[in-house]
């Protein structure tokens, strides 16, 4: 369903990542499957988290090249929008770009900057991430 939605909307790096991940169409991928691809391409891993996590934990994970993944799945009534991230959002929405070396390094650097930031600055960094990475800010030639 979502593959049709992203046609003509997603950048090539994201589409390349979708292909590299080889996400199954008939089941939820296992985190070990995602880790094998991410580690081979950029040295990243996914880290199981309960759902929303504190900013400190978020930046710690990114700084250690681990992307937080909540392992619950949304209900059929929540297919179009869910307020907190589920495994589909994390794997389909974020992991494809983490196969791209440039984006993976950007995310790693963002995590390190977040750890150096004050508590107040972390709020702004988290908002910037939310409004760009979460909602998808992209410009290509």
PLM-predicted stretches and their roles:
Residues 72, 76-141:
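A contiguous, surface-oriented mixed alpha/beta subdomain in the mid-to-C-terminal portion of proteins
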Residues 1-94:
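The feature captures two recurrent sequence modes
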């Amino acid at each position: 369903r979502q593959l049709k939605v992203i046609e003509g909307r997603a950048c090539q790096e994201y589409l390349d990542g979708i292909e590299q991940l080889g996400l199954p169409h008939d089941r939820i991928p296992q985190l070990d499957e995602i880790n094998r691809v991410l580690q081979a391409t950029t040295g990243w891993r996914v880290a199981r988290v309960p759902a929303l996590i504190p900013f400190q934990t978020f930046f710690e994970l990114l700084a250690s090249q681990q992307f937080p993944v909540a392992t619950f799945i949304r209900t059929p009534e929540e297919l179009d929008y869910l307020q907190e991230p589920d495994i589909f959002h994390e794997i389909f929405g974020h992991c494809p770009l983490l196969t791209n070396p440039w984006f993976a390094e950007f995310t790693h650097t963002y995590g390190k900057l977040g750890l150096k930031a004050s508590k107040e600055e972390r709020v702004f960094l988290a908002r910037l991430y939310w409004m760009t990475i979460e909602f998808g800010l992209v410009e290509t030639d």
